[in-house]
């Protein structure tokens, strides 16, 4: 059999407790949700769902082609302008996913002969971007500007440092100001993925780069996703107009991919406009994360202090993490379960995502369920 080796890998996963399965969710779930990335609770907001429905009625179910052919609607342009303005950048480019946005930014901005300095804790999409880039990649220790500075000092020619702004496993924030200084000293660019910062950090949720004073910096490029705080789907790259124009002409995941569906664009626009009107949602998401961490720690659990909306609780083994998450589900609570290879240090975790719309009673219930089922 051509794919007989798959059976061996499946058995190895089973022995290691690393089997993953799909679990379709119903339209109306009875579970309290601390597993999704709907940080601001906007995915089902009437303005967001109506934005999606109206866009589909007006523009159709799909984009019908790549962005360079028929896949760019007037709605795409609106979202790009409003997103760039909200985050404080000159220009923006919408792609079909946050994954595609990261591939676009890294591959198009790391040409042959360049150096890419990548944080050891980066998301898989940034790692894949580094693998596909024509430059040479050097992985440096996690959240270490001095290591970035040292790596950049060994190279002559184009260079970029690449990092998440908020790391998805433990929810810790990157030292963006320090990274920017290291890049500036060596004339390097900085590419950061703000998937977990947009809508949560910065003034009114404008993102981690905005909070660090890097919004609009000509040497900083930011990628974001529309599928977390904005409750939709898709991704975008933000930066100087010259960089965005370069991506339009050089980024393969933009050029050769079908444009983002109008419904997703409409939903993201609705969420972005709602966030502008209700900036307190960002602060509330952070408050909920802090409350979860404080109370879980008080229960004797090993919870990592959150810098944004992700709260990580360490488990003793992959098998125990799976059982713990399953027990929580049986008790009416949905939590994330992260195991190798999704965790960079090999330590399995429950991952909780704080939501701005959680009540005090729901926070207490979640902590009680997690603690009782440890």
Describe each region flagged by the PLM.
Residues 2-61, 188:
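N-terminal "arm"/small-domain region of PLP-dependent enzymes with the aminotransferase-like
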Residues 5, 286-290, 297-332, 342, ...:
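Conserved PLP-binding catalytic core of the aspartate aminotransferase-like
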Residues 42, 46, 50, 54, ...:
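PLP-dependent enzyme catalytic core of the Aspartate aminotransferase-like
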Residues 50, 55-97:
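Conserved N-terminal alpha-helix of the aminotransferase class I/II PLP-enzyme fold
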Residues 105-124, 145:
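Conserved PLP-anchoring active-site segment centered on the Schiff-base-forming lysine
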Residues 138-192:
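Active-site phosphate-binding strand-loop segment of PLP-dependent enzymes
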Residues 210-246:
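Active-site PLP attachment segment
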Residues 265-283, 294-301, 317:
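Amphipathic alpha-helix from the class-I
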């Amino acid at each position: 059999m051509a794919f007989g080796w798959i059976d061996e890998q499946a058995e190895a996963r089973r022995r290691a407790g690393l089997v993953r399965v799909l679990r379709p969710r119903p339209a109306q779930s009875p579970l309290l949700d601390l597993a999704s990335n709907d940080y601001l609770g906007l995915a089902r907001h009437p303005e967001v769902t109506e934005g999606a429905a109206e866009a589909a009625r007006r523009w159709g179910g799909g984009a019908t082609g790549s962005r360079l052919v028929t896949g760019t609607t007037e709605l795409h342009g609106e979202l790009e302008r409003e997103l760039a303005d909200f985050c404080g950048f000159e220009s923006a480019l919408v792609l079909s996913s946050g994954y595609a946005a990261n591939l676009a930014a890294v591959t198009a901005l790391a040409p042959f002969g360049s150096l890419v300095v990548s944080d050891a804790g980066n998301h898989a999409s940034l790692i894949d971007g580094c693998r596909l880039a024509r430059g040479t990649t050097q992985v440096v220790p996690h959240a270490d500007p001095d290591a970035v500075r040292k790596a950049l000092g060994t190279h002559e020619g184009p260079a970029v440092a690449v990092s998440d702004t908020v790391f998805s496993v433990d929810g810790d924030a990157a030292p963006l100001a320090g990274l920017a200084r290291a890049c500036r000293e060596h004339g390097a660019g900085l590419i950061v993925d703000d998937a977990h910062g947009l809508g949560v950090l910065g003034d009114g949720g404008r993102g981690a780069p905005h909070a660090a004073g890097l919004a609009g910096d000509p040497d900083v490029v930011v990628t974001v996703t529309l599928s977390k705080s904005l409750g939709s789907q898709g991704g975008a790259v933000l930066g100087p107009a010259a960089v965005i124009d370069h991506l339009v002409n050089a980024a393969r995941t933009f050029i050769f991919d079908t444009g983002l569906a109008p419904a997703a664009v409409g939903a993201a626009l609705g969420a972005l406009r709602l966030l502008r009107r209700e900036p307190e949602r960002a602060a509330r998401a952070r408050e909920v994360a802090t409350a979860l961490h404080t109370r879980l720690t008080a229960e004797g659990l090993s919870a990592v202090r959150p810098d944004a909306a992700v709260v990580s609780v360490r488990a003793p083994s992959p098998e125990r993490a799976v059982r713990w998450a399953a027990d929580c589900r049986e008790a009416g609570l949905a939590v994330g379960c992260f195991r190798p290879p999704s965790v960079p240090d090999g330590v399995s975790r429950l991952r909780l995502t704080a939501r701005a719309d959680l009540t005090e009673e729901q926070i207490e219930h979640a902590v009680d369920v997690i603690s009782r089922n440890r």
